[in-house]
């Protein structure tokens, strides 16, 4: 549980969270519920491979969605494939700078995520700009569940009581492989045909959030 309580209204919110049991429930000795969020097309507008911090533009409902999930006691983890590293379009520091901008934009409206996990790999080889060290088969690239399972281990997450929200087939497959319930949003690549069936569909991150809160 993290909260800046330097202002009176924030102090009052922390006091309310203590009295409601929210603070105690975030003790990692206790099993946690989580919402795993894909990044591009869910939290931010997918501009076809985000390569620079200036290309990080949040969806209008992203901040209030993440705030609502935290208020309900969920751990919020971003799990994102970032093959821009393997393709040589940016490097690890570049991705970290993009994430720093995302976190700053969220923080400006009072929201935060508990962890950002990203996979820099891509299995396909033969492109001129590619970085060979990252052109490998790995356990973390979705649709494999590695990023979700690693976060589950760190935060003591019960995946059977958690959700994966994504816009692509690989997001849903990763969530299912980890044992999570899944929601596919219609933003980003969410309208592309797929034979993979999620537990629910949603117009965007806010509708996905309201579905999760109603189901808990």
Place the predicted regions along the sequence by residue.
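Conserved Lys-Pro-Asp/Glu-containing loop-to-beta segment of HAD-superfamily phosphomonoesterases
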Residues: 131-133, 139-169
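Acidic, Mg2+-coordinating phosphoryl-transfer loop and its flanking beta/alpha structural elements
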Residues: 163-202
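Short, conserved phosphate/pyrophosphate- and ester-handling motifs at nucleotide-, phospho-/glycolipid
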Residues: 7, 144, 204
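Metal-dependent phosphoesterase signature
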Residues: 44-59, 85-93, 108-109, 131-140
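Conserved alpha/beta core of the MobA/IspD/sugar-nucleotide pyrophosphorylase nucleotidyltransferase superfamily
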Residues: 1-30
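Active-site neighborhood of HAD-like aspartate-dependent phosphohydrolases
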Residues: 31-77
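Substrate-recognition element of Asp-dependent hydrolases with the DxDx(T/V) motif
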Residues: 62, 66-102, 111-126, 175
């Amino acid at each position: 549980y993290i909260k800046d309580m330097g202002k009176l209204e924030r102090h009052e919110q922390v006091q309310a969270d203590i009295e409601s049991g929210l603070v105690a429930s975030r003790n990692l000795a206790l099993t946690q519920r989580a919402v795993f969020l894909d990044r591009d097309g869910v939290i931010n507008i997918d501009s076809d491979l985000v390569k620079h911090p200036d290309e990080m533009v949040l969806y209008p409902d992203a901040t209030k969605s993440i705030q609502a999930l935290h208020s309900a006691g969920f751990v919020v983890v971003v799990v994102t494939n970032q093959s821009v590293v393997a393709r040589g379009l940016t490097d690890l520091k570049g991705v970290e700078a993009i994430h720093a901008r995302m976190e700053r934009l969220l923080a400006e409206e009072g929201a935060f995520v508990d962890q950002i996990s990203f996979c820099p790999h891509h299995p396909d080889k033969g492109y001129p700009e590619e970085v060979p060290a990252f052109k490998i088969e790995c356990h973390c690239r979705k649709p494999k569940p590695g990023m979700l399972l690693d976060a589950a281990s760190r935060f003591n997450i019960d995946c059977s009581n958690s959700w994966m929200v994504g816009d692509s087939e690989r997001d849903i497959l990763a969530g299912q492989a980890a044992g999570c319930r899944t929601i596919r949003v219609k933003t980003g690549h969410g309208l592309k045909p797929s034979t993979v069936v999620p537990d629910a569909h949603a117009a965007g991150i806010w509708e996905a959030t309201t579905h999760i809160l109603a189901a808990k």
